[in-house]
UniProtKB/Swiss-Prot annotation:
Family: Belongs to the bacterial ribosomal protein bS16 family.
InterPro entries: Ribosomal_bS16 (IPR000307), Ribosomal_bS16_CS (IPR020592), Ribosomal_bS16_dom_sf (IPR023803)
Gene (name only): rpsP
Gene3D superfamilies in UniProt: 3.30.1320.10
An example Gene Ontology molecular-function term: structural constituent of ribosome
SUPFAM superfamilies on file: Ribosomal protein S16
Protein name (Swiss-Prot/TrEMBL): Small ribosomal subunit protein bS16
A GO cellular component entry from the record: small ribosomal subunit
PANTHER family: 30S RIBOSOMAL PROTEIN S16, SMALL RIBOSOMAL SUBUNIT PROTEIN BS16M
Record GO biological process: translation
Length: 83
C-alpha cells in the first residue's frame, strides 16, 4: 500500500521531517517515491515550519495513498494557513 508519512532527518535532539510518498513496506527513512514537503517542529522566529505541495498531496490521495495521522493533521494545518 502507498502511504504518505514523515521521514526523520536532522541531528540528535533536533528533528527535521520530510513528507514523503512511499510503499508501506519500506523503512521509515528508506526509499520513497516522491518528496512532497517538509516539517520542522523546532522552527523558531521567521524560519518556515511547514511546507506541503497541496496539489501533489491531493493527487496521491486521489490515487489511493493513505496519509498517516500526523501527515493528515499537518495537511489540514497547511490548508488552514493558506486559506
Amino acid at each position: 500500500m502507498v502511504v504518505i508519512r514523515l521521514a526523520r532527518g536532522g541531528a540528535k535532539k533536533r528533528p527535521f521531517y520530510q513528507i514523503v510518498v512511499t510503499d508501506s513496506r519500506n523503512a521509515r527513512d528508506g526509499r520513497f517515491i516522491e518528496r512532497i514537503g517538509f516539517f520542522n517542529p523546532t522552527a523558531q522566529g521567521q524560519a518556515e515550519k511547514l511546507r506541503l505541495d497541496a496539489d501533489r498531496f491531493a493527487h496521491w490521495v486521489s490515487q489511493g495513498a493513505q496519509p498517516s495521522e500526523r501527515v493528515a493533521s499537518l495537511a489540514a494545518q497547511a490548508k488552514k494557513a493558506t486559506a
